[in-house]
Amino acid sequence: MLRQAGTRLLKVPVCGLRPSITLKRGYAEKAAPTEVPSILEERIRGAYNQAQMMESGRVLSIGDGIARISGLSNVQAEELVEFSSGIKGMALNLEADTVGCVLFGNDRLVREGEVVKRTRHIVDVPVGEALLGRVVDALGNPIDGKGPIKTTERRRVQLKAPGILPRTSVCEPMQTGLKAIDSMVPIGRGQRELIIGDRQTGKTAIALDTILNHKRWNNSSDESKKLYCVYVAVGQKRSTVAQLVQKLEENDSLKYSIIVAATASESAPLQYLAPFSGCAMGEWFRDNGKHGLVVYDDLSKQAVAYRQMSLLLRRPPGREAYPGDVFYLHSRLLERAAKMSPKHGGGSLTALPVIETQGGDVSAYIPTNVISITDGQIFLESELFFKGIRPAINVGLSVSRVGSAAQVKAMKQVAGQIKLFLAQYREVASFAQFGSDLDAGTRATLDRGLRLTELLKQPQYSPLAVEEQVPLIYCGVKGYLDKIPVDRVVEFEHKFIPYLRSSGAEIMEAIRKEGVLSKTTEDSLKAVIKEFLSSF
């Protein structure tokens, strides 16, 4: 046996064997006793020729989920390595004499001096439709007790984002089912829209309602309308993930969803890896001409996990002790969301990253980084949430930079001025509390603003189709709710939608099929609204 620079070469001694006999024999014939030594010699020589070199190293130090290894001189960045205890790790720091490796398991099972061997595989995960309806960990292993995942296709978690030429501009709407978002902050397929806010302001609720809203299209046979969803839970409680899975099952939405869970009890490397794994699973749909949605909930916990790993690997810290490449961490992840051109399959991958702020501070390091990478943000405020305005969207700070090109034309017709009007209303309302003597115009702005705010409220788990949203917003914008008391606006909505389904089915059908509020459809809608208000 030879050993040099961490390389182990196994040699099988060939001794005591007689020279081979060059006698041709058919495979069907029985071997003669004199031929047995030559057959054995050939097989032993063949086994020696097929013997491979196995590169191994030894653990120098272990602690805090980080192992320093010597001997793996040819290991690749982000390659999987396997410890003799069965634990797997990923090589991150490639130094002159040692390799810094993060562990995907309990570091108490690893000992100093333990043998580590290369796998010659960069970290990858299973992909494909077989994962739909399953809950997996950051390495793609099932954790839902439903047995192994039957797929042979695998994909690297770290892949280069599509270039400029394969992409096309965002042009198809991605409906969330929430009136406030679909009207004022529209999202298109292939867009990156950030959901940002303090804890307990309804960030996950928006993402979950978006997944539930697509049941109406995923139950149809039209593949171009379907949206396959990947929900990545990073650093969340296991009970929260279990509730989310249960809610998806109750609403028959788990069948087109994949849950990637790296909960708070998982190690930092798994929390760092989970968003990349979820992205790789979503990319499979994008690259096969389908449409995918990935929710990263949330990226601030991924950044904290990456900071922990980097500091333990002794990488130099920067602002807020994050490493210098934390911007690149998120940009390389979010750039993989794209709308592909028809020449490249026409698929899309939409990203909804979530960032948790501290005390509403959007000027912190990670929030500003992700705001600059994404195509817009939905900003949620604790103050609005506790006032009962849910979803608690701050209209002034929320924006969609590319989604307006993908917005349904009927929605654009009725909701074109609603964002500006609500921003003016909030400004006037802040001054109105100091003075009681208001002119008629200001009073009208306040009254209509109150009703529009009430109209845009929406309970959780009740997404609306666009053909139901358009008539409701039309009522608010055109002043049909001005005579209705503010506390009866919600009652109006609950009664108007069923009435519209029965008496205005052709109006809803026209909006759904044409996507435009034509003159004829608008006249019919006015008649239905007036008829309903006469008996309300």
From Swiss-Prot:
Residues the record lists as binding ATP: 197-204
Molecular function in Gene Ontology: ADP binding; ATP binding; proton-transporting ATP synthase activity, rotational mechanism
InterPro entries documented for this protein: ATP_synth_asu-like_sf, ATP_synth_asu_C, ATP_synth_asu_C_sf, ATP_synth_F1_a_nt-bd_dom, ATP_synth_F1_asu, ATPase_a/bsu_AS, ATPase_F1/V1/A1_a/bsu_N, ATPase_F1/V1/A1_a/bsu_N_sf
PROSITE patterns: ATPASE_ALPHA_BETA
Entries under Pfam families matching the protein: ATP-synt_ab (PF00006), ATP-synt_ab_C (PF00306), ATP-synt_ab_N (PF02874)
CDD domains cross-referenced by the UniProt entry: ATP-synt_F1_alpha_C, ATP-synt_F1_alpha_N, F1-ATPase_alpha_CD
Gene3D superfamilies given in the database record: 2.40.30.20, ATP synthase alpha/beta chain, C-terminal domain, P-loop containing nucleotide triphosphate hydrolases
Subunit structure: F-type ATPases have 2 components, CF(1) - the catalytic core - and CF(0) - the membrane proton channel. CF(1) has five subunits: alpha(3), beta(3), gamma(1), delta(1), epsilon(1). CF(0) has three main subunits: a, b and c.
Role according to the record: Mitochondrial membrane ATP synthase (F(1)F(0) ATP synthase or Complex V) produces ATP from ADP in the presence of a proton gradient across the membrane which is generated by electron transport complexes of the respiratory chain. F-type ATPases consist of two structural domains, F(1) - containing the extramembraneous catalytic core, and F(0) - containing the membrane proton channel, linked together by a central stalk and a peripheral stalk. During catalysis, ATP synthesis in the catalytic domain of F(1) is coupled via a rotary mechanism of the central stalk subunits to proton translocation.
Family: Belongs to the ATPase alpha/beta chains family.
Name this polypeptide is given: ATP synthase subunit alpha, mitochondrial
Biological source species: Schizosaccharomyces pombe (strain 972 / ATCC 24843)
